[in-house]
């Protein structure tokens, strides 16, 4: 079933795939990594000026990684927000997605956390570095194929 935003994107010739609706009735769309930045700018101009959250997850061991964006558009009033969920899937061998930091500044720490935990590289992010794990940490802890070390010694600050 095609939602309102999906119909609008089709009308304007923007490539995407409708994934239906979630349990709250929020439309979910899949965007290719190479199209994501331009579609993000278009969505911002169209009125989706609030990035509610960004997260990422490992779809399956050895499979794809996903970066998920929850966007909100408030046109008629605060009590009637229009929401959409965007999913961008990337291969785990070279997980690269254009950063939308320059579109929604609030994605800064969220993209950094996705990088730190899953190793998704957000191209053109101004400060893409580990945010939760020490810089010396090896691997991506939230990947399903991650093997946790038996021991990790945290160095003292002095």
From Swiss-Prot:
Gene3D superfamilies linked to this entry: NADH:ubiquinone oxidoreductase, 30kDa subunit
**By its UniProt entry, which InterPro entries does this protein fall under?**
NADH_DH_suC (IPR010218), NADH_quin_OxRdtase_su_C/D-like (IPR037232), NADH_UbQ_OxRdtase_30kDa_su (IPR001268), NADH_UbQ_OxRdtase_CS (IPR020396)
Q: Which UniProt keywords apply?
A: Chloroplast, Membrane, NAD, NADP, Plastid, Plastoquinone, Quinone, Thylakoid, Translocase, Transport
Establish whether keyword Translocase is in the entry. yes
**Main location group:** plastid
EC number per UniProt: 7.1.1.-
Q: How does it sit in the membrane?
A: Peripheral membrane protein
Q: Name one GO cellular component term.
A: chloroplast thylakoid membrane
The GO molecular function terms of this record are: NADH dehydrogenase (ubiquinone) activity; quinone binding
- One Pfam entry name: Complex1_30kDa
Q: Name one GO biological process term.
A: photosynthesis, light reaction
| SUPFAM superfamilies for the chain | Nqo5-like
- What is the annotated localization of this protein? Plastid, Chloroplast thylakoid membrane
Per its record, the protein catalyses: a plastoquinone + NADH + (n+1) H(+)(in) = a plastoquinol + NAD(+) + n H(+)(out); a plastoquinone + NADPH + (n+1) H(+)(in) = a plastoquinol + NADP(+) + n H(+)(out)
* Function comment: NDH shuttles electrons from NAD(P)H:plastoquinone, via FMN and iron-sulfur (Fe-S) centers, to quinones in the photosynthetic chain and possibly in a chloroplast respiratory chain. The immediate electron acceptor for the enzyme in this species is believed to be plastoquinone. Couples the redox reaction to proton translocation, and thus conserves the redox energy in a proton gradient.
Spell out the family assignment given in the record's similarity comment: Belongs to the complex I 30 kDa subunit family.
NCBIfam families, per database record: PRK12494.1
Q: What is this protein called?
A: NAD(P)H-quinone oxidoreductase subunit J, chloroplastic
What is the species listed in this Swiss-Prot or TrEMBL entry? Answer: Fagopyrum esculentum subsp. ancestrale
Q: Which gene encodes it?
A: ndhJ
